[in-house]
Regions:
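Short, extreme N-terminal segment that most often corresponds to the first beta-strand
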Residues: 1-38, 129-150, 280-284
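A generic structural motif
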Residues: 25-32, 92-101
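Intrinsic-disorder/low-complexity loop/linker signature
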Residues: 45, 184-185, 267
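Acidic, low-complexity cytosolic segments
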Residues: 73-98
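Short, highly charged C-terminal tails/helix-capping segments
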Residues: 94-114
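Extended, charged low-complexity segments
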Residues: 215-284
Length: 284
């Protein structure tokens, strides 16, 4: 018979620690069918969001998880599906048509599924860089990193750790800005690096998806990093003073190996730099 669609918050509360960052908490008392889709995570564990929505025509709750979700993401979705199936007394159907109940869903071989996905990606002849969209930050994979992961003693744990480290990094992820140079008409891509601030910069810069229609790679004549010093109270915007704009590649080449670490195939986390070191780097 017909079952009333559960309020969004009741679906979220079926398993401990799940939240959505798509909507304000005050809205979650409404029926799940009132929402187009929700991005859901278990903060501290999740890396890729689970997309939750109610399909009105099928009278079904749909959960979507990306192909390259981490082990923790998979464990969460199975736990959640099981809890909902138990609550509703319904079966679970995957996208291949296989059916499970609240207990047998735990037999789904997600480890083999994830391993095959990683192997297939590594063997893709067209692979240059592959971007996963985590709930907080993108993660960049390339063949070299995938080989390192697949050659490790526990590839799935290794992969999950790479993704998790990026999602939960406390560093500032510098976002590129573009501006056109008056003299040449060329475009400059510009990042920032502030004194005493852990900062993530790309090894190889690129035009993010949201700028692709406005910025042509062929027009970019330089990639710069604005170095910023703090001259007073760090809580006051006027304390932040630009020192110099240096070439990104030159800056990264000038860093000592102890001053940064690679997060993934393209993102570098630069450890907090002192004012003295920042002023040195302004000369590169």
């Amino acid at each position: 018979g017909y079952q009333k669609v559960m309020p969004a918050k009741d679906v979220l509360n079926l398993v401990e620690g799940v939240l959505t960052y798509s909507f304000e908490e005050a809205m979650l008392g409404r029926s799940l069918k009132d929402f187009p889709a929700m991005m859901c995570i278990r903060y501290g564990k999740s890396c890729l969001p689970i997309i939750l929505r109610y399909l009105d025509q099928e009278h079904a709750y749909q959960f979507i998880l990306a192909d390259f979700a981490t082990l923790e993401d998979w464990r969460l979705i199975l736990e959640w599906l099981s809890a909902l199936a138990r609550q509703l007394g319904n079966e679970i159907h995957d996208n291949l048509g296989t059916s499970y109940d609240a207990d047998s869903i735990f037999s789904f071989d997600y480890e083999n599924y994830l391993l095959k996905n990683l192997q297939n990606l590594e063997q893709d002849p067209d692979l240059h860089q592959y971007q996963l969209q985590g709930f907080a930050h993108p993660v960049i994979l390339d063949r070299e990193l995938l080989r390192k992961i697949l050659d490790s003693a526990q590839p799935l744990e290794e992969f999950s750790q790479v993704v998790k480290k990026v999602q939960y990094s406390s560093a500032f992820f510098s976002q590129v800005r573009f501006y056109r140079q008056n003299e040449t008409g060329g475009i400059i891509g510009s990042y920032s690096l502030t004194e005493d601030t852990d900062t993530v910069l790309p090894r190889v810069p690129f035009v993010p998806a949201e700028f692709v229609e406005k910025v042509n790679m062929d027009e970019i004549i330089d990639w710069k990093v604005n170095l910023v010093e703090i001259t007073g109270n760090p809580d006051m915007p006027e304390s932040y003073k630009p020192v110099a704009a240096v070439n990104l590649e030159a800056l990264l080449s000038a860093l000592d190996s102890s001053e940064f670490e690679l997060l993934d195939a393209n993102q570098i986390e630069i450890k907090k730099l002192s004012k003295e070191r920042l002023l040195q780097l302004a000369q590169v």
